[in-house]
Amino acid sequence: MASDPFVHQDLGESVLVSESRLGRLQMVVRSTGYAFLADEPRSVGGLGSGPDPYGLLAGALGACTAMTIRLYAERQGWPLERVQVSVQHHRASLEARDLFERSIYLEGPLDEAQRTRLMEIAERCPVHKTLDRGSDIRTSLTPVMAQAAAEGAGSEHMRDMEQAGI
């Protein structure tokens, strides 16, 4: 059964990335019931229809940071009204360590001790920890196409997203 190319692998908690077939570098990213586009800018042959891979990585860091801060502030009962995180990615060369610069905006009547503590908590976000310590990556070739890739993910939806400038 595993050798049949039409048998589909269960996705489980995986993130699945498949070509949209609407653009040379446009990908459909699926994760836990959601789908969005990833792409490269037009300047390198993409359609510019979604974040590039480093934009996704920076977005993961920013989202995790904001969520971690929000959850901590709520648990403490602190008056955090809004959190916003800006992340920039820099790499001087292929051999150099990458640098992610985070700017965190905290809105609300927080005192200085609360603001300081929330900045410390930002360092504890799980994505921050993963990036900070590095990761091992295991890659394998599979003869089985994952289920969501075969479902055809609605090329009309992808065209609608493109036409809408999304």
Language model features: what each stretch is:
Residues 1-59, 70-166:
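Extended beta-strand/beta-hairpin segments
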Residues 64-65:
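Alpha-helical metal-binding/catalytic segments enriched in His/Glu/Asp
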